[in-house]
């Protein structure tokens, strides 16, 4: 059976080496996020200040996988 995961939204607060980021979730938790392979393959750039969707395991809630970068409402893209 596939492992159950929680999906949260959060804000990238800090960029760390090797594709790792410090993410502040909407519930004010601070966790360590790493970039998923699909985002890495698509060359999607993630910077501090971006809003992301992050998938968190029920067994280790201090780490998560960034699965989607949300569009900023104030950008001109």
Curated annotation (Swiss-Prot):
Keyword annotations of the record: Chloroplast, Initiation factor, Plastid, Protein biosynthesis, RNA-binding, rRNA-binding
GO molecular function, one term: translation initiation factor activity
Subcellular location: Plastid, Chloroplast
A Gene Ontology cellular-component term: cytosol
SUPFAM superfamilies, per the entry: Nucleic acid-binding proteins (SSF50249)
One family name in Pfam for this protein: eIF-1a
Lineage top rank: taxon: Eukaryota
Xref: InterPro entries: NA-bd_OB-fold, RNA-binding_domain_S1_IF1, S1_domain, TIF_IF1
Domain S1-like: start-end pairs: 1-71
HAMAP family noted in UniProt: IF_1 (MF_00075)
Subunit structure: Component of the 30S ribosomal translation pre-initiation complex which assembles on the 30S ribosome in the order IF-2 and IF-3, IF-1 and N-formylmethionyl-tRNA(fMet); mRNA recruitment can occur at any time during PIC assembly.
Family, similarity comment: Belongs to the IF-1 family.
Function: One of the essential components for the initiation of protein synthesis. Stabilizes the binding of IF-2 and IF-3 on the 30S subunit to which N-formylmethionyl-tRNA(fMet) subsequently binds. Helps modulate mRNA selection, yielding the 30S pre-initiation complex (PIC). Upon addition of the 50S ribosomal subunit IF-1, IF-2 and IF-3 are released leaving the mature 70S translation initiation complex.
Protein name: Translation initiation factor IF-1, chloroplastic
Provenance organism: Nandina domestica
